[in-house]
Swiss-Prot record:
One of its GO terms (cellular component) is extracellular region. Gene3D superfamilies: 1.10.530.10. The active site is at E71, D84. Residues 1-10 have a biased composition (Basic and acidic residues). It catalyses: Hydrolysis of (1->4)-beta-linkages between N-acetylmuramic acid and N-acetyl-D-glucosamine residues in a peptidoglycan and between N-acetyl-D-glucosamine residues in chitodextrins. GO terms for molecular function: lysozyme activity. Pfam families: SLT. InterPro entries: Glyco_hydro_23, Lysozyme-like_dom_sf, Transglycosylase_SLT_dom_1. This is Lysozyme g.
Amino acid sequence: MPYGKIEDIKTSGASDVTAAQDGLKEGGWKSSHRMAEIDSNRMENYRTIINEAGRQCDVDPAVIAGIISRESRAGNQLINGWGDHGKAFGLMQIDVTPPPNGGGHTPVGTWDSLEHLIQATEILVEFIERIKTKFPRWNADQHLKGALAAYNKGEKNVESYASVDAKTTGKDYSNDVVARAQWYKSNMGF
């Protein structure tokens, strides 16, 4: 995969705030792994389309699974495919809020379709390219982690690698997604 090697990325995992949403006592990568595990049965339902979206977009399927787990808990937090009070769509929660406050994306496919996963993964790839341009000295793993933060809050909010999650939801988005993706890679073979 040209966009970093998820299993090699250092991560602190979920924040205490994110972990508490699942009744977990403290944050960290163990809590991220536990949340990924909780979502694993639902995630299995999407394995085929996750793998296909990864293949078509040349993105590690484990990264896609990590985003799905964080964004929608593998669909469990969606109402008719919508989340974030109607501002985000699908398993990967693409932002439909008009710019400048949102991504302004028009959803493609149904909320749980291959078309949706390809659209959302292409958005991630676009953020990878923007982060590469913004931070040309970063390595591929750093670009991926920065792009994950940008997927959540836009590339303008990624100011340095040391503070990659400073402006993300829970101040942990990329670290949590990386840890969840690592769990899916190791335990479900994504």
